[in-house]
Curated annotation (Swiss-Prot):
Family: Belongs to the TRAFAC class translation factor GTPase superfamily. Classic translation factor GTPase family. IF-2 subfamily.
Region described as G3: spans on this chain: 357-360
GO molecular function, one term: GTP binding
Record keywords: Cytoplasm, GTP-binding, Initiation factor, Nucleotide-binding, Protein biosynthesis
NCBIfam families tied to this protein: IF-2, small_GTP
Protein known as: Translation initiation factor IF-2
Organism field: Coxiella burnetii (strain CbuK_Q154) (Coxiella burnetii (strain Q154))
Residue ranges with Basic residues bias: 156-167
Gene name of this polypeptide: infB
Pfam families: EF-G_D2, GTP_EFTU, IF-2, IF2_N
Residues reported to bind GTP: 311-318, 357-361, 411-414
PANTHER family: TR-TYPE G DOMAIN-CONTAINING PROTEIN (PTHR43381:SF5), TRANSLATION INITIATION FACTOR IF-2-RELATED (PTHR43381)
Subcellular compartments: Cytoplasm
InterPro entries (UniProt xref): DNA-bd_dom_put_sf, EF-G-like_DII, IF2_II, IF2_N, P-loop_NTPase, Small_GTP-bd, T_Tr_GTP-bd_dom, TF_IF2_bacterial-like
Segments for region (G4): 411-414
Length: 803
């Protein structure tokens, strides 16, 4: 602490400089003027003196007040009367330190220790004087109430027990019992402490510290893993778990103390409670793996470009690739549309090119995004007779997101209605400008049917590849990307891997996302087995533990034990995150259902041939859900339909859908015996349309009202049997019996009900047409007046469909 003057210290401890000089003099510090400097040693000396003097004074100085009360009463029982005298005595003994604590508010700012200690004596003297005045006033009031009683002034003295005078023997026994009980209570209250025990008041005075409560809440940085329990989250924020549960209830989530929540939910809770979330990823094992593998060393050599063919459905993408490969790939796809990512390595006269053929249907957005992610050049196929379509625009966006150049192939120029110039104009609205218009995009008119312009397109692709200077290391551990995966009967999980660098060999340990395994076989795009694959080569890999997710990175690991450890770690982490999100969504659905009616649900067990198709179908079917009906995919997987799938469908009342897969013989027997709805599809259009029809059948019926006729009340007749009969004139349409009606008065609906009787000339009739008079009886309504209008309408059910 820096030296300061006496005046500055007095301002700091909030006392007068003269008072501080007196205390310094008592402490033996030789300072006589307020402008003199006081050192740290002199401050400690002053503080020690104040502590010593204060503890001595507080040990001796106590305020002790004794109050006595006497109450006289007469109890009568028959002819006898008994005088009852009740005497009570109360002693107030209050230490100075306790008075100070009760009267002084808690400090809100942290001040130096010398400030509290210096002012302690002055405050204590004021508090004792205030207490004495209050007690004297109370004694005076007691004296006014009982004038015959002797006044006793409060006395201060040593802490000795004040004994009561004994009661005379003449007192009644009930009075003696009550006084005896009062005496025990008083003895217990004023019990002496042993002489050897220290005085608690002196000890508390000596231990008084200069600590002040924090004036602002403590803001912590809370590290959040990908999933965390509520108890662990509360511990990280140093609060009780009940506080976290309360905060989540305010946010609309009912949780328990041991429930796991995902990282996003935990971050919202932490921010709600005033702390800072820090999102962390538990990737220590993977970081160690990357450090072990390190960067690939070796000389980078030129590699073949990876070209992705994208565009709208039926614009001729696969036909173009078919002409290049001289094979009929299109004939193998159901309905003539591509539903998988096909990876093909083509050797042309100008060089090697790897083609990826992506689906054009809107459901395969994720597939197209993966195709653009692992590609070097995008060939955008646009039909000259059809123009720019939604999936064409989406393909442009994927190419921009992946930052890859685009080559536009204007297909079907052999058709008479082809207009290539219109294609250029439409694409220019999406910032795709041809080179002749000052842009940087190459346009090439082609015909996949006749082969016109195909060679020029390949030249443009290889020219663009030369500009990009594509190179990769062709030796060392391989790295690649999973383009597609499926479960093949007899061969197990099959993954199509596009090698991006290094060289993949038979027998390598391959780690792909949550799956791993030794490469047992490799098959090229031509269907022949191969022993190795270099950069830009697509191969089918057999031997993995399961079907990996399409788009995952594939890495060759030197140790199988390490690959197994990392795969299991990823599986556990994925399971925790999935359960946390599922539980959160389940609780949110509970709150959503509280105020709503029951939502009709269509349960589906979905099986597909490849992972990409399964992913696209799941997303497309989930998009069909509305507020009234919902698609619930209770199970999905890659591979054929098994008995376990059918048993699950039986238990959950679900429809089994197979996309390009079939059920085996025992499964078909079980399906026929149990009557399970099993459907096969090979075209995604048909599958989505059928599910839409099924959902439309689950929609609640909707009724449409149609006004049939309108009658005006001209007179009202009263009948003892029926009640009020309205004599009406039909002014519009036809009035039919037993149809619902509305009674209008001044064009305001005052009653809705049923038409009970319809008569004409005292005869019951089925209907009355326009311009005819009739008598109308309204069921359970007699307040019909002249001038009212009776509107007759009918309800028709409208067939509802999912948009």
């Amino acid at each position: 602490m820096a030296d300061m003057s006496v005046k500055q210290l007095a301002d700091l401890v909030r006392t007068t400089p003269e008072r501080l000089l007196e205390q310094l003099k008592e402490a033996g510090v030789a300072i006589t003027h307020v402008d003199q400097t006081i050192s740290d040693e002199e401050k400690r000396k002053l503080l020690l003196h104040l502590k010593t003097s204060h503890s001595t004074e507080t040990g001796k100085k106590r305020s002790k007040i004794v109050l006595k009360r006497k109450k006289l009463s007469v109890v009568k029982s028959g002819k006898k009367s008994v005088n009852v005298e009740i005497r009570s005595k109360r002693t107030y003994t209050k230490p100075v330190v306790e008075q100070k604590r009760e009267t002084e508010p808690a400090p809100t700012q942290e001040v130096p220790l010398t400030s509290d200690t210096t002012n302690l004596n002055e405050k204590a003297e004021v508090n004792v004087a205030t207490l004495e005045k209050a007690v004297e006033a109370e004694v005076k009031e007691e004296a006014k109430k009982t004038p015959s009683e002797k006044k006793e002034t409060p006395k201060k003295g040593p802490r000795k027990e004040t004994r009561r005078s004994r009661k005379p023997d003449k007192e009644d026994k009930w009075e003696r019992e009550e006084l005896h009980m009062t005496k025990l209570v008083e003895e217990r209250r004023r019990r002496h402490k042993p002489a050897h025990m220290p005085d608690s008041d002196n000890a508390s005075a000596k231990l008084e510290q200069g600590f002040a409560r924090p004036t602002a809440p403590v803001v912590r940085e809370v590290a959040l893993p990908e999933s965390i329990t509520v108890a662990d989250l509360a511990q990280k924020m140093s609060v009780k778990a009940a506080e976290v549960i309360k905060a989540m209830m305010k946010l609309g989530a009912m949780v328990t103390i041991n429930q796991r929540i995902d990282q996003e939910t935990a971050a919202i809770v932490v921010e709600e409670m005033g702390h800072k979330p820090k999102l962390i990823k538990e990737d220590v094992l993977e970081e160690n793996l990357v450090a072990t593998l390190g960067e690939q060393t070796g000389e980078a050599v030129p590699r073949a470009p990876v070209v992705t063919i994208m565009g709208h459905v039926d614009h001729g993408k696969t036909s173009l690739l078919d002409y290049i490969r001289r094979t009929k790939v299109t004939s193998t796809e159901a309905g003539g549309i591509t539903q998988h990512i096909g990876a093909y390595h083509v050797e042309t006269e100008l060089g090697m090119i790897t083609f990826l053929d992506t689906p054009g249907h809107e459901a395969f957005t994720a597939m197209r995004a993966r195709g653009a992610k692992c590609t070097d050049i995008v060939v955008l196929v646009v039909a000259a007779d059809d123009g720019v379509m939604p999936q064409t625009v989406e393909a442009i966006q994927h190419a921009r997101a992946a930052k890859v150049p685009v080559v536009v192939a204007v297909n079907k120029i052999d058709k008479p209605e082809a207009d290539p110039e219109r294609i250029k104009t439409e694409l220019s609205t999406h910032d795709v400008l041809p080179e002749e218009w000052g842009g940087d995009t190459m346009f090439q008119p082609i015909s996949a049917k006749t082969g016109e312009g195909i060679d020029a397109l390949l030249e443009r692709i290889l020219l663009q590849a030369e500009v990009l200077e594509l190179k990769a290391v062709d030796n060392g551990p391989a790295r690649g990307m999973v383009v597609e995966s499926r479960l093949d009967r007899g061969r197990g999980p099959v993954a199509t891997v596009l090698v991006t660098s290094g060289e993949l060999h038979l027998g390598d340990i391959l780690l792909v996302g949550r799956e791993y395994g030794r490469v047992r076989a490799m098959i090229g795009d031509d269907g022949r087995p191969c022993e190795s694959a270099g950069p830009s080569m697509p191969v089918e890999v057999l031997g993995l533990s399961g079907t990996p997710v399409a788009g995952e990175e594939a890495i060759v690991v030197p140790d199988e034990r390490k690959a197994r450890e990392i795969a299991r770690f990823r599986q556990g982490k994925y399971r925790e995150v999935r359960l946390a999100k599922k539980q959160t969504a389940h609780l949110e659905r509970i709150f959503d259902r509280m105020g709503e009616g029951k939502q009709n649900t269509l349960n589906i067990v979905l099986k597909a041939d490849v992972q990409g198709s399964l992913e696209a179908l799941t997303e497309a079917l989930n998009k069909l859900s509305t507020d009234e009906v919902k698609v619930n995919i209770i199970a999905s997987g890659v591979g054929g339909i098994t008995e376990s799938d059918v048993n699950l469908a039986i238990a959950s009342d679900a429809v089994v859908i197979g996309f390009n897969v079939r059920a085996d013989a025992p499964t078909r027997v079980l399906v026929e015996r149990e009557g399970v709805d099993l459907r096969y599809y090979s075209i995604i259009y048909d599958l989505i349309d059928e599910v839409k029809k099924a959902l439309s059948g689950l929609l609640a019926p909707e009724f449409e009202e149609k006004i049939v006729g309108l009658a005006e009340v001209r007179d009202v007749f009263r009948s003892s049997k029926i009640g009020a009969i309205a004599g009406c004139m039909v002014v519009e349409g036809v009035v039919r019996r037993h149809l619902p009606i509305r009674v209008l008065r001044d064009n305001v609906v005052i009653y809705e009900g049923q038409l009970e009787s319809l008569r004409r000339y005292k005869e019951d009739v089925a209907e009355v047409r326009q311009g005819t008079e009739c008598g109308i009886g309204v069921k359970n309504y007699n307040d019909v007046k002249v001038g009212d209008q009776i509107e007759v309408y009918e309800k028709t059910q409208v067939h509802r469909t999912i948009a």
